[in-house]
Design a protein with these regions (language model features):
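A short, charged/proline- and glycine-enriched loop
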Residues: 1, 9-13, 120-133
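Secretory-pathway glycan-assembly enzymes, especially type II membrane glycosyltransferases
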Residues: 1-110, 293-296
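Catalytic donor nucleotide-activated moiety binding site of glycosyltransferases and closely related
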Residues: 6, 10, 14, 145-184
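Short loop/turn segments at strand-loop or loop-helix junctions that form parts
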Residues: 46-47, 59-63, 124-135, 160-162, ...
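A donor-sugar binding/catalytic signature common to diverse glycosyltransferases
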Residues: 47-53, 185-231
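Short acidic, S/G/P-rich loop/turn micro-motifs used as interaction or catalytic elements
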Residues: 50, 133-140, 163-165, 206
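Leloir-type glycosyltransferase catalytic cores
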Residues: 71-124, 227-298
Length: 298
């Protein structure tokens, strides 16, 4: 199990510590791994790759405090969100309130130890939420950031990800002014609540938090890399459903077809996992032997 394995976390996030609320998902991880094995599937935590539609690997990660299951195939993981939205068989659960309460109760941060030096950095009307150093150069459009900065002047903050190098932070200050760059360790969700508009990427949980709280939310991604992120297939649909965000979230996330699991609201979460794996395996079966990536055995 990788989601809460100390050695694995040390490699991925270094000295940062995950929010303790995420440990509620540990039982889900164990159950998912067992069910994947029973169905002849490999499993992988927080990894993106492109396999055939008859995929080998069931991927999983955390998303806005939820457990998120998806196959390592773009076509199928995008279709599962569409199928979930069109599913009328699942009881509707109030996921929107769950997400809003996470912000209000200061539980939305993925990492612990977020600083609250808010008096030093008074809120502004617009907030740009950036990914970590390993993603910011390849996923974020600098031309878009310059355009946004020109539009809002000094009425905007750029929030570096907690995993951001001093070099990147220095470059941000050079580009957009030191007074417009928030500390990487400050509580971003305080500023998200105060802002009128949010700019973020398709690979960030801040997208759903901005949208569910009614903030006008827009992307800052480079188009050519946009579909590679593990949250793209959720955030892409969310960005086009801002007018009915709460009902979209509730209907989609409540469906087992979404791959979203949360034991705090999904009373029969094991059944939801079972139904999801059965559903995605049936979709997978359609493509058996359609595309062959290894030469046939003689």
């Amino acid at each position: 199990m990788e989601m809460f394995n100390k050695k694995e976390l040390d490699k991925r996030i270094g000295p940062l510590k995950k929010n303790k609320k995420l440990y509620d998902l540990e039982a889900v991880e164990g159950y998912v791994i067992r069910k994947a094995n029973e169905n002849g599937l490999e499993h992988s935590y927080d990894v993106m790759a492109e396999e055939m539609p008859y995929f080998k690997t069931l991927a999983y990660t955390e998303y806005a405090g939820n457990f998120y299951l998806q196959p390592l195939n773009f076509k199928l993981r995008n279709e599962q969100l569409i199928d979930a939205y069109n599913d009328n068989s699942s009881e509707i659960v109030d996921y929107s309130s769950l997400l809003i309460n996470r912000i209000v109760n200061n539980e939305a941060n993925k990492y612990t130890g977020r600083k609250e030096e808010f008096s030093k950095y008074l809120p502004k009307d617009y907030l740009v939420v950036l990914p970590g150093s390993n993603k910011v150069r390849e996923n974020v459009c600098l031309n878009r950031l310059k355009y946004i900065s020109k539009q809002h002047g000094d009425n905007i903050y750029f929030k570096p990800h907690p995993i951001t190098t001093h070099q990147i932070i220095g470059e941000l200050k050079d580009f957009f002014g030191e007074e417009n760059i928030l500390p990487r360790d400050i509580n971003m969700y305080y500023y998200l609540q105060k802002a009128k508009g949010i700019y973020t990427t398709h690979i960030s949980e801040s997208c759903i938090y901005g949208i569910v709280t009614g903030k006008k939310t827009e992307p800052i991604d480079v188009w050519n890399n946009i579909q590679r992120g593990s949250f793209y297939c959720i955030n892409n649909h969310l960005l086009t459903h801002q007018h009915d965000a709460k009902s979209f979230i509730n209907k989609t996330f409540s469906s087992y077809k979404s791959g979203i699991i949360n034991p705090s609201v999904d009373i029969n979460w094991k059944e939801k996992v079972d139904k999801y794996i059965d559903y995605i395996c049936k979709k997978r079966e359609v493509y058996k032997n359609w595309f062959i990536d290894n030469p046939p055995k003689k």
